[in-house]
Swiss-Prot record:
Function comment: Involved in the hydrocarbon hydroxylating system, which transfers electrons from NADH to rubredoxin reductase and then through rubredoxin to alkane 1 monooxygenase.
Domain Rubredoxin-like: start-end pairs: 4-55
Organism taxonomic ancestry: Bacteria, Bacillati, Actinomycetota, Actinomycetes, Mycobacteriales
Record has Cell membrane as a keyword: no
Family, similarity comment: Belongs to the rubredoxin family.
Binding site for Fe cation: C9, C12, C42, C45
Note on cofactor: Binds 1 Fe(3+) ions per subunit.
GO biological process: alkane catabolic process
Requisite cofactors: Fe(3+)
Alphabetical list of SUPFAM superfamilies matching this protein: Rubredoxin-like (SSF57802)
The protein's name: Rubredoxin 4
Keyword Methyltransferase: no
PROSITE patterns registered for this protein in UniProt: RUBREDOXIN, RUBREDOXIN_LIKE
Length: 60
């Protein structure tokens, strides 16, 4: 089990999974939320990084 977290956009529901990253924006798998630039925005709706919230997930 790992300690990667999942963050969800409050505007559109887009999910950022630290384990997966977002290679389309140059964010490699394993990139922690805190290491993503503050000016990064939701790829689906353009919402600010501050509009995301952490989601509790159980990984197996």
């Amino acid at each position: 089990m790992n300690d990667y977290k999942l963050y969800q956009c409050a505007q559109c529901g887009f999910e950022y999974d630290e384990a997966v990253g977002w290679p389309e924006d140059g964010i490699e798998p394993g990139t922690r939320w805190d290491d993503i630039p503050e000016d990064w925005s939701c790829p689906d709706c353009g919402a600010a990084k501050s509009d995301f919230f952490m989601v509790e997930v159980e990984r197996r």
